[in-house]
Structure formats: C-alpha cells, structure tokens
Amino acid sequence: GGLSTAEGLPTSNLPLRGGKGWLYEGGIREPYIIKWPGAAEPGTVCREPVTSTDFYPTMLEIAGLPGRPEQHLDGKSLVPLLRQEGGVDRNTLFWHYPHYSNQGGFPGAAVRKGDFKLLERFEDGKVQLYNLAEDIGERNDLAETMPEKVTELRKLLHDWYLEVDAEFLYPKEEGGAVMPWRPGE
C-alpha cells in the first residue's frame, strides 16, 4: 500500500507558481464560491480579484447589519458583484507574510494593482514584478525591465506598511548575527 508519487507530486497548482505559504499566485489565488439564491445566478463566474477580508463586510451587508464604529474593516462588500450591479471599489490588493513557514515560502509582502503584481522579500529587499494578464505562472520577472512600475508599486506597498503599522521580522542569517530589515533600510 501507500501513496506512490512516481509520476510527480500528489497535488499541483499548475499553471500557477507556488503553493500554501507562498506569495506567488499558487499560494494566494483561490476560488471564492458563494451561493446566494435570488441574487447570484447559478454558474455565474466573476473574474474580479477579491480577498478573504471581503467576507465579513459582505456578510454584514447581506444580513442588513451595520459595522461597529470601533471595528476597522479592511475588506469591501462583494454584494454589488454578487447581484451583478457593479464591481468592488478597489484596484489594489495587499498581502503580508512577515514570517517563516514550514511550506518553504519567504517572509515578504505583495501588492497587486491592475494586472501587475510586485513581491518584496523581507530578508534582502529584493523585488519581483509580474504582469499577471500575460504571465499567470509568474515565470517572467519584469523588475529589471520596468523600473518605473517597480517604483510605483513599491511606494504603494511601503505606504501601506505605514498605514496598517505592519509587523516585520528578524530574518535568519546563516552563521552570523540576526539583522532586522524594514522598508527603506
């Protein structure tokens, strides 16, 4: 008995790169399935990017409940999308993983604006830039050929760090001192 993986890995996110614990699309792009009789037609597919923080404000709106003033909502209600009345009033998404994990990902953050996504590694500040419309598998790093786009997205990401008071880590250093890294250092 047992599991044989002679033909390859037991699971795959292809054509997406990475998996759980990674900032690549294979780790953050997931189907979001909602059933709401009378609002969304069965089989409807929406390609607008959303995030898990959108779930809470969506449920509040569906239930007809106001958000509490002391609560800060990072997400946006998806009700206009579900009712096919419009989109979500947002064109930028952020992800922040300031830690090591057992899945092999790296501590870092990402920002997506339109079709472009920038990843920033916290260990060394290295960035990667991808055009997801043309490269869903994130194989062609455009950071060196599009420095103006890197600057634009990196500024958005660093401004967001300050806005949300993002936490950072002390990266592991092989055989040396542990040195902190923060944006702009």
Regions found by a protein language model. Name each.
Residues 3-25, 40-44, 48, 53-132, ...:
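C-terminal cap/loop subdomain of S1 sulfatases and analogous C-terminal strand-loop tails that border
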Residues 29:
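Conserved nucleotide-sugar donor-binding catalytic segment
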Residues 132, 147-150:
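C-terminal structured subdomain/cap of oxidoreductase catalytic cores
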Residues 141, 151, 161-162, 172-185:
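Extracellular/periplasmic ectodomains of large secreted or surface enzymes and adhesion receptors
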Residues 89-90, 154-173:
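Bilobed periplasmic-binding protein-like "clamshell/Venus-flytrap" ligand-binding domains
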Residues 32-34:
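Short glycine- and hydrophobic/aromatic-rich loop-to-beta-strand nucleating segment
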Residues 135:
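Intrinsically disordered, low-complexity polar regions and short flexible loop motifs
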